[in-house]
Amino acid sequence: MPSPYVVAIDPGHGGSPTSDPTQLWDPGVVVGSIMEKDITLDLALRLRTLLQRERVKVVLTRSSDQYVEISERWNRAHAAGARMFVSLHVNAYDGDSTINGLAVFYPKPDSFSFAQAIDSGLAETLKRFQIADDGVAIKPELWVRTDVPTVTVEPAYLTNPRERSLLLQDDFRDAIAMGVFQGMIAADPEIEQTKVQLAHSEAAATAQHLASAAATADAARTATATRWGLIIGGLAVLFVVMRAAIRRQSRLPQPPAYRRRAYRRRRSVSRRY
């Protein structure tokens, strides 16, 4: 069976304050009670669901509210054999709440086409929400250790009141996840090819399993029929033997009736005298 296509999804930031001052945590952008870390994790889980439906193996750099070092995030992706790396964030701009829009960043030139595919997917799914598309931009300081196509996605500004309101809505989050998903699928046709190969292999394995189960059932039925045949055959032989014995018994000579009566009469006479 072919190996699944592996991707890494990185929900930015994470962790919560504890009584241990040495325990690090990073909420990301915070506006009131809304924290970037919670939004990015939710987006990652939605995106994972979409990818898994396509038989893609998804590695999350974090799957709960925990702090993970940047180097460890990449180590987890690399150890799993990820062939794409998508880091999810939301944007912010201090001092001007009117700044808005979608942006996709990439760390190195070899990730440019990947960034364009992700940006195109998001621009399409967020069009109905009237989100401005700022396009793609290179940021060499981002994820410099990666050796696979890598992007950082900033779909909206948490500091913009309108976009903040959208970020709290399920349909907007679904649209973000769908846009990133469509961009990933478009970026590498091998994702779809692997899906087809896996589907064929699974179908063949299922057919083989069903054939094996049917053969086992046939063998069991044959064995049962054989056992019943032996039992019935044995009973038939026993019946024939018993019937022959009964017939032989019925052909044995019997004393005549008058002899039996005379014998009884003589015994009666002797008792009188």
Locations of the language-model features?
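Extracytoplasmic/secreted envelope proteins and their assembly/folding machinery
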Residues: 41-44, 48, 71-74, 101-102, ...
